[in-house]
Amino acid sequence: MLTIALSKGRILDDTLPLLAEAGIVPTENPDKSRKLIIPTTQDDVRLLIVRATDVPTYVEHGAADLGVAGKDVLMEYGGQGLYEPLDLQIAQCKLMTAGVVGAAEPKGRLRVATKFVNVAKRYYAEQGRQVDIIKLYGSMELAPLINLADKIIDVVDTGNTLRANGLEPQELIATISSRLVVNKASMKMQHARIQSLIDTLRAAVESRHRG
C-alpha cells in the first residue's frame, strides 16, 4: 500500500491533476467528503487528508510514504528526515517581510510578527539583527497597524491584501512552491514503485510548463 499525505485547499486542487497523470484518482471528492483516508482508482494507493503543517510529520514518521508540502512548511517545520525529489511548481508564492508603506526602519530591536517563527529566527540571525518574534496564526497584516510589530513575515501571492491594509512587501526570504516529499525508509522498501511515480509526476510537471 502506498499512502500519500495531502492537505485540502490550493495544494490539493493543484496536485490531483498531476496524480491523475499517474492514474491515481480519488474515488470520491476529498473537498466534499468527511473521510480523512480516501481510496483511489488504484487499489494499492490511498490519500491521507491532513493539515498542511502536519504533512512533513506524517511522512517523516512513516504514517505516509509520500506527501505534498509547501516549501514554506518544510522550512518552518523541518524536512530533514525526508527526501525532497521534486518541485511540483504548483501553489507558487513568495515568503517575504512586509511593513507599513513609508515607515522608517526602526532602530534597535525589531519586532516581527509571523507564524514562521523558525524561519524568522534564522533569517535575522544570518543578518546579525536582534529581533523579538511575536507568533501569530492569522491576520498578520493587523500587527504593524496597531503597533504590535514593526514588520511581518508572511506568504505573499498577489500582495493585494498587504496593499489594502497600507503595507508593502519588502525583503524576499524565499520563493515558495509545493514539493513532493518521500519517507526515506519507504524509498528503500518500495523504490521501484515510488521512483516510477516520481518520474511520471516529473514528466507531467515538465509537460505542463512546456505547454
UniProtKB/Swiss-Prot annotation:
Enumerate the subcellular locations listed in this protein's record, separating them with semicolons.
Cytoplasm
User: Can you state the subunit structure given in the record?
Assistant: Heteromultimer composed of HisG and HisZ subunits.
Catalytic reactions on record? 1-(5-phospho-beta-D-ribosyl)-ATP + diphosphate = 5-phospho-alpha-D-ribose 1-diphosphate + ATP
Q: Which NCBIfam families would you find in this protein's record? A: hisG (TIGR00070)
A GO cellular component annotated for this chain's UniProt record is: cytoplasm
Keywords in alphabetical order: Amino-acid biosynthesis, ATP-binding, Cytoplasm, Glycosyltransferase, Histidine biosynthesis, Nucleotide-binding, Transferase
Q: Please give the family membership noted in the entry.
A: Belongs to the ATP phosphoribosyltransferase family. Short subfamily.
The protein's GO terms of the molecular function aspect are:
ATP binding; ATP phosphoribosyltransferase activity
Q: Does the keyword Transmembrane apply?
A: no
Please name the pathway.
Amino-acid biosynthesis; L-histidine biosynthesis; L-histidine from 5-phospho-alpha-D-ribose 1-diphosphate: step 1/9
Q: What is this protein called?
A: ATP phosphoribosyltransferase
PANTHER family on file: ATP PHOSPHORIBOSYLTRANSFERASE, ATP PHOSPHORIBOSYLTRANSFERASE ATP-PRTASE
